[in-house]
């Protein structure tokens, strides 16, 4: 049983390391951009500044050069 548990834990850990790659080798559509896969942008809820870019391009200024990336729901059109 311990051996099976270790295998399950190992599988779960491996799956977490590569969440954007499906078992058939294709990228998951929700993480289809290179920026998200390479984590070159900040996700919603992460801190941001004028020197860092949010994946959804929405950094809410919190003052003193700090901000928070807004969480933008999918399938919602933002008006500027």
Swiss-Prot record:
One of its GO terms (molecular function) is toxin activity. Its main location: secreted. Residues 1-8 form the signal peptide. Disulfide bonds join 41-55, 48-59, 54-69. Expressed by the venom duct. It is found in: Secreted. Residues 9-40 form a propeptide. Belongs to the conotoxin O1 superfamily. It comes from the Eukaryota. GO terms for cellular component: extracellular region. It comes from Conus bullatus (Bubble cone). This is Conotoxin Bu14. Keywords: Cleavage on pair of basic residues, Disulfide bond, Ion channel impairing toxin, Knottin, Neurotoxin, Secreted, Signal, Toxin. The presence of a 'disulfide through disulfide knot' structurally defines this protein as a knottin.
